[in-house]
Regions:
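Conserved beta-strand in the GNAT
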Residues: 56, 62-71, 83
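A short, polar/charged loop-to-alpha-helix boundary motif
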Residues: 74-80
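C-terminal "cap" of GNAT-fold acetyltransferases
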Residues: 116-161
Length: 161
């Protein structure tokens, strides 16, 4: 067994990122909702400015996990933070510390932007993962709800200038 390595993803890693995101959608039983593509990852993640960054965990050049994140700013804190959009570790690689390692590497990367916190959301059906996050120090914020605007309502607001 080779050493587990973490690296900042490059455009050449877009197919591996896509493959891991596809597996994540399957694990969450959300394949029908997943409409990402390698092209979209290349376009939005590796252009200037990038819409997201990614950290990959691998062993012997085989991708085992990833963290996809972007920077945000809290007006209430007056500080920058990270929002982890997706964190995924392949089932056979769980329990090896990759999830915490991916978060740690994202935080290291975020030091370039003076981040002081990490924000993320967990699917309601993903109780095992919720326990993982709580074990490493995340706390649940009960005074917020996640809302989404897309499709026709989004188009109506965009078109009504």
């Amino acid at each position: 067994m080779g050493k587990i390595e973490f690296k900042v993803a490059t455009i050449e890693d877009a197919p591996a990122i896509f493959s891991l995101l596809e597996k994540l959608s399957q694990d969450l039983d959300k394949e029908k909702e997943f409409s990402g593509s390698v092209k979209a990852l290349e376009k939005y993640g590796f252009s200037e400015p990038p819409a997201f960054e990614a950290i990959l965990a691998s062993q012997n050049n085989k991708p085992l996990g990833l963290a996809v994140f972007f920077y945000e700013f809290s007006t209430w804190r007056g500080k920058s933070g990270l929002y982890i959009q997706d964190l995924y570790v392949t089932p056979k690689s769980r329990g090896l510390g990759l999830g915490a390692g991916l978060i740690k590497e994202a935080i290291k990367r975020g030091q370039l932007k003076d981040v002081v916190y990490v924000n993320l959301a967990v699917h309601n059906s993903n109780n095992d993962t919720l326990g993982f996050y709580e074990n490493i120090g995340f706390i649940e914020i009960n005074d917020k709800k996640t809302l989404l605007l897309e499709g026709k309502p989004f188009d109506m607001l965009r078109e009504n200038n």
